Regions:
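A structural signal for multi-pass alpha-helical bundles of membrane permease subunits
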Residues: 11-299, 303-305, 340-627
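Short, Lys/Arg-rich, polar N-terminal cytosolic tail immediately upstream
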Residues: 1-12, 317-333
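Cytosolic-side transmembrane-helix boundaries in multi-pass membrane proteins
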Residues: 292-327
């Protein structure tokens, strides 16, 4: 009797294919995330020393945690400052982003230009660039904190409120610079709103202010939560963050209690738990009243009441000439008249200038001669154009060597990340399998894990695998879906593939194409916008990464890292000139720093303006917001 041939059911086949496509992520998660997280916690319970023979562990329980809270409280105090600043910046950045997304969603001229300006800092600003601009007060508008209004607020509400206002104004450009992604995401979401809802609410007598609170805000509320979390994670992982700098410094010290890998791991876990608590609080805050929110996506059953407002008879309403002038100045709705549009253009132009001011400062200061630098009568504009600063900065950075290093460290991991995240996103979007929702939740959860939690175990693992010190420490995690910000890219592909009809895949299968062939020949070519946005942002984020690059690849020479070593490199090239000597031509100064900063961001500037259409429009078309 012949045995019955075993055949998979459709459901089983879907599960097998789904797990096959996400298998890279499963392997990568356990190797590059789950194991490092568990091992990091284990290290935090030990005194760790790293002799030449390996690693020595001595179990000490929670002594490292106790030491962090009771004795060496440097990181804890810095963490408190970070939380205050992060909460303030999260709120201001997202309020600003919502306002300007709504402005860009209006029918205004030069929309593409303003959008390009607002997105510029996202692409080119790395930790060292931000640090150089901070050191030279280039991201503080001149006189911004001298307004009398600050004194008035201080006298009315107290010194603490006045200090808060000063802090906000001092960090205004920084906050604006961190808002580019959020503006684009809100803008994409607003463009998806049904205009009929606004028209219906307008007929009902709703003012623009009421439309915002009752129509727009409920619709974008889920995206506000996502952007708040993204902002928090972005601030927590920024290489200039003092908390992660302190954690890294302790890691490289001796293996006593209060120093070394064990203590650094304990600090990392404290940091992680604080971020996780903030994320949970955000979820709880945004879940309040969620059941009472009604998302209006169409006009069906929308109640209209045109007797809500009655217009009183006044001179303005009765006189035709006055009514005509008023209509031109104020518009029919108050938001389409000359006065409002003039205000909008002045506001958006002022903010665009604020975005560009550091680059203007950078360019003009870099052209100043040493004489201009020390002459108090010379303002921002140099008296003569002095290109020698660029000659010295070019030599100090070692431009071509650093450029080659930046490309090597950015290109291969970016390509690996595109490949892996596309496969994973396709598997999640196209196939139903058991534990799929759990996989998605875990993928999203990994986004909030700060780099310090993973860096110590991965450092030791890469050392044992022989990939420490080369670009493999970036390529292998990226190849298994665990690269820089891989969660975002997986979700981009997941959302984009969901917009492509499954009938195309089914037609290709009927023609005899296998699942891999369908993915490569049918679905992936349709996902070009998503591929472009993932590659460009992967490339840029690997390019700008200095914290992990400096840790994993000792001696790496990239443009951002060379900028962070600028002063030491300058002394090697030109000697340590006495700053009090009369011959100060070769002395390092602000102009040379600015020239070095501009040189370090020049390749990204050229790439951004050459490909800005892809940078900005691909975000629009890639389904980054989800639904």
């Amino acid at each position: 009797m012949m045995k019955k041939k075993f055949r998979l059911t459709f459901k089983q086949r879907e599960s097998v294919l789904g797990y096959m496509f996400i298998s890279l992520w499963i392997i990568g998660f356990f190797v590059f995330t789950f194991y490092p997280v568990i091992y990091s916690f284990f290290l935090s319970l030990n005194r760790v020393t790293i002799p030449t023979t390996g690693i020595d562990l001595e179990f000490i329980g929670f002594a490292n945690f106790q030491h962090a809270f009771a004795i060496d409280r440097v990181m804890i105090l810095e963490l408190g400052t970070f939380i205050q600043d992060a909460v303030l910046m999260m709120v201001i950045i997202n309020v600003f982003a919502v306002i300007f997304a709504m402005i860009l969603n209006m029918d205004i001229k030069f929309k593409g230009f303003f959008r390009t300006i607002f997105f510029l800092p996202v692409v080119i600003v790395s930790g060292p660039v931000m640090q150089e601009l901070l050191n030279n007060n280039a991201i503080i508008l001149p006189g911004i904190t001298n307004f009398q209004v600050i004194s008035v607020f201080s006298s009315i509400f107290g010194e603490s409120f006045g200090e808060l206002i000063v802090k906000v104004f001092n960090n205004l450009i920084s906050m604006f610079w961190f808002s580019g992604v959020q503006i684009i995401v809100y803008l994409v979401m607003l463009q998806k709103m049904n205009k009929e809802v606004y028209e219906a609410s307008e007929i009902d007598g709703a003012s623009p202010w009421e439309q915002f609170w009752k129509v727009t805000l409920p619709f974008i509320k889920p995206i506000i939560l996502i952007n708040m979390i993204y902002t928090l994670v972005m601030l927590a992982g920024f290489s200039n963050n003092r908390v992660i700098i302190i954690i890294k410094d302790y890691m490289l010290k001796t293996g006593e209690v209060g120093a070394g890998f064990g203590f650094s791991a304990a600090l990392s876990w404290i940091y992680f738990l604080v971020i996780a608590i903030i994320v949970v609080l955000l979820f709880l805050l945004f879940s309040l009243g969620r059941r009472n929110i009604k998302y209006i996506r169409n006009t069906e059953h929308f109640h209209l009441d045109m007797t809500r407002y009655t217009e009183k008879d006044t001179f303005i309403n009765k006189n035709p000439t006055v009514k005509k002038i008023r209509k031109k100045l104020m518009g029919r709705k108050g938001t389409d008249g000359w006065v409002f549009r003039l205000f909008v253009y002045l506001l958006i132009a002022s903010v665009a200038f604020t975005f560009l001011y550091p680059f203007i400062y950078l360019a003009l200061t870099s052209l100043q001669s040493p004489e201009d630098i020390i002459d108090a009568t010379v303002g921002l504009v140099p008296r003569t154009i002095y290109f020698e600063n660029y000659v010295k900065a070019f030599k100090t950075i070692g431009f071509f060597t650093a450029l080659e290093g930046s490309i090597r460290i950015s290109l291969l991991p970016a390509l690996a990340q595109v490949f892996s995240t596309a496969l994973i996103g396709y598997g999640l979007a196209r196939f139903d399998f058991k534990l799929k929702k759990l996989v998605v939740v875990i993928i999203l959860f990994t986004f909030i894990i700060p780099a310090p939690v993973l860096m110590i175990p991965t450092y030791l693992m890469y050392r044992d695998l022989g990939i420490l010190g080369n670009v493999g420490s970036f390529i292998y995690p990226a190849l298994f879906g665990q690269g820089l910000k891989s969660t975002i890219f997986i979700m981009i592909f997941y959302q984009f593939f969901n917009t492509i009809p499954k009938v195309l895949d089914e037609a290709a299968r009927v023609d005899g194409a296998g699942p891999i062939r369908v993915f490569l020949r049918v679905t992936l070519p349709l996902a070009v916008p998503a591929v472009v946005v993932v590659f460009l942002f992967s490339f840029v984020w690997y390019w700008n990464e200095t914290y992990l690059t400096g840790l994993y690849i000792d001696g790496a020479r990239t443009l951002p890292l060379q900028l962070s070593r600028f002063a030491a490199s300058f002394r090697e090239q030109f000697g340590n000139v006495d700053p009090n000597a009369e011959d100060f031509v070769d002395r390092i100064n602000e102009a040379i720093y600015m020239a070095g900063t501009l040189i370090s961001i020049l390749p990204l500037l050229l790439m951004y303006f050459g490909l800005q259409k892809w940078f900005v429009e691909s975000v629009d078309r890639s389904g980054i917001t989800g639904e």
